[in-house]
Amino acid sequence: MFIIAIGDVHVPHRSYGIPPEFKKLLVPEKIQHILCTGNLVSKEIHDYFKVLTSDVHIVRGDLDENTSYPDTKIVSIGQFKFGLCHGHQIVPWGDRASLAALQRQLDVDVLISGHTHVLEVFESNGKLFVNPGSATGAFSNISNDVIPSFVLMDVQSNNITVYIYKLIDGQVKVEKIDHVKQQ
């Protein structure tokens, strides 16, 4: 089962759109779920995600005007509970201890957050933490030099294979991390 973690797109205010190098990889009917950390800013990106899969979960970013998106969301997929938040609620932004506190509060196996626009995937105390970065490379308050990125997760039983996609100098680079759910 394929899950895309993506966010901080900022179209049209900070970016023209998802890079074509990524769009070639995001094929309809191959992806079962999209978990988005927000800051889409425009309806255009939401509609694009719905073309990829009907199962799209989005939380509200600090710049999203769509107030129907929740601040946090829990999604059960297979044997895993995924928690989703934009990340502007985490103080300081991206702080691992604060992320772990939210993970415990939501009682999830995987916490997906954004806001920093910096890709980060790590394990802590048997839990998986994913920040997919910015899919468009939109600048942030932290950095003007943001590498476009997103994360693909392949969920099989109690395993998640995490594929990290980065667009560097016009080339898509992929890294892989394996995570096993602790019982």
Swiss-Prot record:
GO biological process: intracellular protein transport; retrograde transport, endosome to Golgi
EC number: 3.1.3.3
Source organism superkingdom: Eukaryota
Binding site for Zn(2+) 2: N39, D62, H86, H115
Catalytic activity of the protein: O-phospho-L-serine + H2O = L-serine + phosphate; O-phospho-D-serine + H2O = D-serine + phosphate
Cofactor: record remark: Binds 2 Zn(2+) ions per subunit.
GO terms for MF: L-phosphoserine phosphatase activity; metal ion binding
GO cellular component, one term: endosome
Residues that bind Zn(2+) 1: D8, H10, N39, H117
SUPFAM superfamilies recorded: Metallo-dependent phosphatases
Keyword Zinc: yes
Bilayer topology term: Peripheral membrane protein
UniProt keyword Hydrolase, yes or no: yes
Swiss-Prot/TrEMBL keywords: Endosome, Hydrolase, Membrane, Metal-binding, Protein transport, Transport, Zinc
InterPro entries per the UniProt record, alphabetical: Calcineurin-like_PHP_lpxH, Metallo-depent_PP-like, PdiEstase_YfcE_CS, Phosphodiesterase_MJ0936/Vps29, Vps29
Assembly information from the UniProt record: Component of a retromer subcomplex consisting of vps29, vps26 and vps35.
Function of the protein: Plays a role in vesicular protein sorting. Component of the membrane-associated retromer complex which is essential in endosome-to-Golgi retrograde transport. The vps29-vps26-vps35 subcomplex may be involved in cargo selection.
Protein name, UniProt field: Vacuolar protein sorting-associated protein 29
Native source species: Dictyostelium discoideum
The gene coding this protein: vps29
